[in-house]
Amino acid sequence: MNDYIVVKCGGSMLDQLNDVFFDCIKKLQQQYKVVIVHGGGPEIDAKLKDCNINVEKRDGLRVTPKEVMDVVQMVLCGSTNKKLVMNLQKHNLLAVGCSGCDGNLLQVQPVSGEIGYVGEVSYVETALLKGLINMNYIPVIAPVGINDNEIYNINADTAAAGIAAALSAKELILITDVDGILHEGKLVKKTDESEIATFIEKGVITGGMIPKVQAALASLKMGVQKISIVNGTKDFTEDTGGCIGTTVTRGVSIV
């Protein structure tokens, strides 16, 4: 059991996770070293609304001035992270919640002054993750990072990709509420960058699936070898250790 698997669960999925999801994590943990990265978009939006703070996004990234960063940190590092940790432990999966600023886990470079405290992963302190895993804990990571003693918001997809690349993970699994990419009603089991571009152009991939495949493509560019888009509300694991869903790699034809 030497290979790492990184599981990214978006904020919109956290309230949909059921016993099947946690059973899948148990099965993955029997064969791999598992790290979980979560988002928290809907809860952040709700809290900002409660605080009468405007929600603004540019090119898929949350505009994060200081007052927004305070809320992001409170939600991601607090309630969202701890709910997921407690849910894992309710299902007999030992977990430790931490953020990217704990132990300098995720160091970042600012994306742009125009969008405030938003960073891209520049360094991952993998020793911390490996230490937790060696003690049989699942690290559950809130996607904030640190630069020059300031905390930055990180897009959860890019945080997960950065961690997967740093760990040379065998796979990055993106948890969604659909079975994967569908073409003419059938699941596309394997695809690559060029085919995804064609699918988007032809309207095969639309709506909420577009940001998911864009996250997969960005992950490939960061060095992740394989990304699986799976339905977290169903059993997405195979007995062989693979995933049931759409697998995105470099230069692979559709099967």
Swiss-Prot record:
A Pfam short name: AA_kinase
Principal place of residence: cytoplasm
Keywords: Amino-acid biosynthesis, Arginine biosynthesis, ATP-binding, Cytoplasm, Kinase, Nucleotide-binding, Transferase
Pathway per the UniProt entry: Amino-acid biosynthesis; L-arginine biosynthesis; N(2)-acetyl-L-ornithine from L-glutamate: step 2/4
Binding site for substrate: G40, G41, R62, N153
Reaction catalysed by this enzyme: N-acetyl-L-glutamate + ATP = N-acetyl-L-glutamyl 5-phosphate + ADP
Site feature (Transition state stabilizer) residues: K8, K212
EC class (word): transferase
Annotated GO CC locations: cytoplasm
Molecular function terms from GO: acetylglutamate kinase activity; ATP binding
Subcellular location: Cytoplasm
Gene Ontology biological process: arginine biosynthetic process via ornithine; L-arginine biosynthetic process
Similarity section: Belongs to the acetylglutamate kinase family. ArgB subfamily.
HAMAP family reported for this sequence: ArgB
Name under which the protein is recorded: Acetylglutamate kinase
Species annotation: Bacillus cereus (strain 03BB102)
